[in-house]
Amino acid sequence: MSTDPVQVLQPDGFNKSRWTQLPRDVLIGHQAIMQLPDIIADIKPGRSVLLISGGTTREVAGNTVADILKDQYEVRRFVAGKLDADTLEACSQASSSADFLIGVGGGRVIDCAKIVSYKQGKPFISVPTAASHDGIISGRATLPTETGSVSVGAHPPIAVVADTGIISQAPHRLMASGCADVISNYTAILDWELAHRLRGEQISEYAIALSKMTAEILVKDANLIKPGQEEAAWIVVKALVSSGVSMAIAGSSRPASGGEHKFGHALERLMPGAALHGEACGIGSIMTMYLHGGDWREIRSSLARIGAPTTPRELNIPDEVIVEALMKARDIRPERFTILDMGLTRESAEHLVQMLYEE
């Protein structure tokens, strides 16, 4: 028997850490906008605010916000037209003396507030007037470029105030687009799991579970998503918030952005403005679910029940443009591995597009 001392193996030390940024307050519901002063009083971000809105959303909700805050806060106004470098610079200058920012509007306005507040290190409050995509709560923003758009890092809002009465009166196409954005989570998480198996990419089971559950609930309640219904706005906004939280938990957009989003960005480069973000992702999700061998018909059926497009024809987009977008998707964020990065041929892409029209 050996008399050598026993060697005790020391396991490697645990060294994981993650900084998860989430909104401090989230208020969703009927006349929620009237409780904005209470939210601000709870957060205590300061006394001077830059109120950012769009030309239309200024009338829809921006003026209301200004009126309910003017007696307690120093309110300055900024109207964000198109989101570009000049607008961001002008907004930055306008916000130089503000303690915090409030974005009242759709995706463009919220992204403007998100980017400017992030660069200046100031908090911002998100007051969406439409439920068109999960950017109302996420820490990423979409910045248009000459060749389409790019996703840039920012930080999530310190608070979200979503008035379901206002949101329900927005064009139904916007809400249907938001639904499609959430439903596309199904294929986003399949792509993430694929990257984990083939490339060793780290995944978050918590983020995946939340993202999938959010998509499942929206599919289950698809028949309730009707134009002008405040209950529909309630369901969709909660889903968008949950989807945004899943990204915050993951520390990236992975649980809500896969090949269907790469396809969507490629389509935007080829035909800018032809489809809303969520609409493109919804159609992309039908095709990528087919490639994953999943139930693509269920996704298509759910989108149709909500009123979101399921074919290029509904958006007046030529089929060959969709084929080209599928082929170019691999060039979008090449570091993000998805099912579209596994050697899709043009012939297969053409088959995918024709499959969209099958009964």
Swiss-Prot record:
The protein's enzyme class: oxidoreductase
Presence of keyword Lipid biosynthesis: yes
Cited InterPro entries: G1P_dehydrogenase_arc, G1PDH, Glycerol_DH
Gene Ontology molecular functions: glycerol-1-phosphate dehydrogenase (NAD+) activity; glycerol-1-phosphate dehydrogenase (NADP+) activity; metal ion binding
Catalyzed reactions per annotation: sn-glycerol 1-phosphate + NAD(+) = dihydroxyacetone phosphate + NADH + H(+); sn-glycerol 1-phosphate + NADP(+) = dihydroxyacetone phosphate + NADPH + H(+)
Subcellular compartments: Cytoplasm
Keywords, sorted A to Z: Cytoplasm, Lipid biosynthesis, Lipid metabolism, Metal-binding, NAD, NADP, Oxidoreductase, Phospholipid biosynthesis, Phospholipid metabolism, Zinc
CDD domains assigned to the protein according to its UniProt record, in alphabetical order: Gro1PDH (cd08173)
Gene Ontology CC: cytoplasm
One Pfam entry name: Fe-ADH_2
Cofactors, names only: Zn(2+)
Binding-site residues, substrate: 134, 181, 265
GO biological process, one term: glycerophospholipid metabolic process
Residues that bind NAD(+): 107-111, 129-132, 138
Binding site for Zn(2+): 181, 261, 277
Pathway assignment: Membrane lipid metabolism; glycerophospholipid metabolism
Entry EC number(s): 1.1.1.261
Cofactor note: Binds 1 zinc ion per subunit.
Function: Catalyzes the NAD(P)H-dependent reduction of dihydroxyacetonephosphate (DHAP or glycerone phosphate) to glycerol 1-phosphate (G1P). The G1P thus generated is used as the glycerophosphate backbone of phospholipids in the cellular membranes of Archaea.
Family the entry assigns: Belongs to the glycerol-1-phosphate dehydrogenase family.
Stated name of the protein: Glycerol-1-phosphate dehydrogenase [NAD(P)+]
Provenance organism: Methanospirillum hungatei JF-1 (strain ATCC 27890 / DSM 864 / NBRC 100397 / JF-1)
